[in-house]
Each structure stands twice: as C-alpha cells, then as structure tokens.
Amino acid sequence: MEARAILRHTPTSPRKMRLVADLVRGKQVDAAKAMLAHSTKHAARTVLQTLSSAVANYSQANPEKRLDESELIVKRIYVDQGVTLKRILPAPMGRAYRVRKRANHLTIIVDEANPTDEQN
C-alpha cells in the first residue's frame, strides 16, 4: 500500500526542484532524509518536509504495520510546473523587463521496499 504527499504552488523554479528530486528517487527513506538534511540546495528543505509528510501519511493509512523508515522507499517523485507569475522590472530608457516568477507542484509517493503478497 503506497502513500503520497503533494505540495502545490511552491515558489521555486521546477528546474531547481528537479535537481533535488533526482537525488532521492528510488532511495530508501532514511537514506533520502540523510541526503536532504546535508544538501546545500534551498529546495532540499522543501523536499524533506514533503517526504516526512508522505511517511506520516503511510503510517496513518497502515496503522497495523510498524515499519521502520529503512523499509520504505521513495517509489516515485516528480515535479510539475505550476503557475508562472509575470512581474515587471523597470529598465533603462523607459523600457520594462518581464520577470517570470515560477512555481511548481511536488508529488512524492512512498511504498514498502519489498511488498508482501496479501492475496492468499
């Protein structure tokens, strides 16, 4: 049984967030949390909080299972582009430059590392 956490409208460029998401894709949750905690990227903190939320959602959905974080893996993690806010920056000689403030949507899905067959 998998669980997911979705964070929408994060004020970070999707390209920068994907750099961090690629670090933890397919890793065990405890190893992924250790990597994110020691990462210098600003987006790592956001991914760490969302990953913790996904683990909490898994434990809420499966109260009978007492799994350690080393038994969970980051099954899927992906970053979609959100709304782009367009702002104006005054430029020389009466011109104006357009500034695009990008946002993204982060989705993390966690699951057991070796799910057992319960269809007996």
UniProtKB/Swiss-Prot annotation:
Pfam family, one: Ribosomal_L22
Alphabetic keyword roster: Ribonucleoprotein, Ribosomal protein, RNA-binding, rRNA-binding
An annotated Gene Ontology molecular function: rRNA binding
Highest taxon listed in the record's lineage: Bacteria
Keyword Kinase: no
Record has Ribosomal protein as a keyword: yes
GO biological process, one term: translation
GO cellular component, one term: cytosolic large ribosomal subunit
Quaternary structure annotation from Swiss-Prot or TrEMBL: Part of the 50S ribosomal subunit.
Protein family (similarity comment): Belongs to the universal ribosomal protein uL22 family.
Summary of the function given for this chain in its UniProt record: This protein binds specifically to 23S rRNA; its binding is stimulated by other ribosomal proteins, e.g. L4, L17, and L20. It is important during the early stages of 50S assembly. It makes multiple contacts with different domains of the 23S rRNA in the assembled 50S subunit and ribosome.
PANTHER family: CHLOROPLAST 50S RIBOSOMAL PROTEIN L22-RELATED, LARGE RIBOSOMAL SUBUNIT PROTEIN UL22M
Entry protein name: Large ribosomal subunit protein uL22
